[in-house]
Design a protein with these regions (language model features):
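Residues forming anionic-ligand binding surfaces in small-molecule and nucleic-acid pockets
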Residues: 149-168, 207-246
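Hydrophobic (often cysteine-bearing) scaffold residues that line and stabilize catalytic clefts
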Residues: 17, 178, 236-241, 252-255
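Conserved small/polar residues in nucleotide/adenosyl-binding loops
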Residues: 259-262
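Alpha-helix capping and helix-loop boundary segments enriched in small/acidic/polar residues
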Residues: 173, 231, 250-253
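Phosphate-backbone binding interfaces of nucleic-acid-interacting proteins
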Residues: 1-202, 206
Length: 262
C-alpha cells in the first residue's frame, strides 16, 4: 500500500524525517518495502525565468536567455517548445543535471548554437496533470508567476515528498488506509491525531426512496446506508487528485474519486 508522507502530515504533526519515520515503523512491526523519494533521479534542475527570446532562423528552435538566480542570470538555452513567452518561469535543467530515467544533461550545440542546458516539460520531470496542473501540456511546464529563479524545482512542483510502500499483514486490517497508518504514526510519535473536519449535516428522511433490509441479522447485526441527493458530476479538487495520484490512482470524477479516498 502506498502512503504519501505529505498526506500523513495532514493527520499528525510529524517532527521527524521520512527516513526516521521509516525506521520507527519498522521497529513497530510494519514492513516498509520501499521509501520512494518523488524527486528520485532529479538533480540541478531549478526555476528559470525567460528574460530574452529570439527565434533561431532556419530552425524550429528558440534561443532563450534564462535567469537562474545564483546559478547565473543570463544562461543561454535553446528549446524546440513554442508555448512559452517572455517572463515565464520554467524548469531549467542546467549543465551537469540529471532527469528521471538516468538522463544526463550537458552543454552542447543545437543547430550550431550553444545551449547550456534544457528547458523541461512536466513529463520530463515525471509529473502528470494530477500531480501538478499543466504537466501534460505539449511543450514546457509553465510555473507559477511568483516562482523564484534559481530555486530547486522539487518544492515548486510538489516533488519534495516521499511515498511509503508498506506491506500490510493480515492481522492489521485497521491499517489498510492512510488514516489507519496515520493513527499508528500518532501513537509512535506520541502526537495527537487530527481527524478530518466534517462540515455536512445529515438529515433523517423517512421517505427516502431507498430501503435497507438485513436478511441475516445474526451474521450482520448492523448495516448503515447514506442517501445523498443533488450530486453534480465534475472534476475533483486539485488536492484530491494529487492525493490519489501519489497513491498510484488516476482521477476519474468527483463521485468516483470520493469513493476511492473514503
Amino acid at each position: 500500500m502506498k502512503v504519501p508522507f505529505s498526506w500523513l502530515k495532514e493527520y499528525v504533526d510529524i517532527d521527524v524525517t521520512a527516513q526516521e519515520l521509516e525506521e520507527k515503523l519498522f521497529s513497530c512491526g510494519f514492513e516498509v518495502e520501499e521509501l520512494i523519494p518523488l524527486d528520485a533521479g532529479i538533480s540541478k534542475v531549478v526555476v528559470g525565468k525567460i528574460v530574452e527570446m529570439e527565434k533561431q532562423e532556419g530552425t524550429h528552435l528558440t534561443k532563450c536567455v534564462v535567469d537562474c538566480g545564483d546559478y547565473g542570470h543570463d544562461i543561454r538555452i535553446s528549446t524546440g517548445a513554442a508555448n512559452m513567452k517572455l517572463g515565464d518561469c520554467v524548469p531549467a535543467a542546467l549543465d551537469g543535471s540529471t532527469l528521471p530515467g538516468g538522463i544526463k544533461i550537458k552543454a552542447r550545440k543545437m543547430q550550431g548554437v550553444e545551449s547550456n542546458g534544457m528547458l523541461c516539460s512536466g513529463e520530463e520531470l515525471g509529473l502528470n496533470e494530477d500531480l501538478f496542473p499543466g504537466s501534460e501540456v505539449y511543450g514546457l511546464l509553465i510555473l507559477p508567476e511568483d516562482s523564484v529563479p534559481g530555486t530547486d524545482i522539487a518544492p515548486v512542483v510538489g516533488l519534495d515528498d516521499y511515498i511509503f510502500d508498506i506491506s500490510i499483514t493480515a492481522n492489521r486490517p485497521d491499517c489498510q488506509s492512510v488514516l489507519g497508518i496515520a493513527r499508528e504514526v500518532a501513537a509512535i510519535l506520541g502526537k495527537p491525531l487530527h481527524m478530518p473536519a466534517m462540515d455536512y449535516k445529515a438529515v433523517c428522511e423517512p421517505d427516502a426512496p431507498i430501503t435497507v433490509k438485513v436478511e441475516a441479522p445474526d451474521l450482520c447485526p448492523r448495516y448503515m446506508a447514506h442517501y445523498v441527493r443533488n450530486i453534480r458530476m465534475g472534476e475533483s479538487p486539485r488536492w484530491m487528485k494529487r492525493h490519489l495520484a501519489l497513491c498510484g490512482l488516476r482521477s476519474i470524477s468527483n463521485v468516483v474519486d470520493r469513493k476511492s479516498v473514503v
